[in-house]
Amino acid sequence: MARKALIEKAKRTPKFKVRAYTRCVRCGRARSVYRYFGLCRICLRELAHKGQLPGVKKASW
């Protein structure tokens, strides 16, 4: 879990646009966040396996 200060810092509009970054809305992780879901890869996988993300299913080929 990310520190609350870092989560609040990410919400602010930065002085320069390139400094903006996404954080996972569930755990606050800053790396590997899927913009479409707003979740990091770990939370995305957990919720997909539980069936809590509509339209997401496990790939098999």
UniProtKB/Swiss-Prot annotation:
PROSITE patterns membership: RIBOSOMAL_S14
Complexes and interactors: Part of the 30S ribosomal subunit. Contacts proteins S3 and S10.
Gene Ontology BP annotations: translation
Record's protein name: Small ribosomal subunit protein uS14
Domain of life: Bacteria
Entry similarity comment: Belongs to the universal ribosomal protein uS14 family. Zinc-binding uS14 subfamily.
NCBIfam families in the cross-refs: PRK08061.1
Signal peptide limits: none
A cellular-component GO term for this protein: small ribosomal subunit
Gene symbol of the encoding locus: rpsZ
Source organism per UniProt: Thermus aquaticus
Cofactor binding mode and count: Binds 1 zinc ion per subunit.
Binding site for Zn(2+): 24, 27, 40, 43
GO terms of molecular function: rRNA binding; structural constituent of ribosome; zinc ion binding
Keyword annotations: Metal-binding, Ribonucleoprotein, Ribosomal protein, RNA-binding, rRNA-binding, Zinc
Cofactor: Zn(2+)
Function: Binds 16S rRNA, required for the assembly of 30S particles and may also be responsible for determining the conformation of the 16S rRNA at the A site.
InterPro entries linked to this entry: Ribosomal_uS14, Ribosomal_uS14_bact, Ribosomal_uS14_CS, Ribosomal_uS14_sf
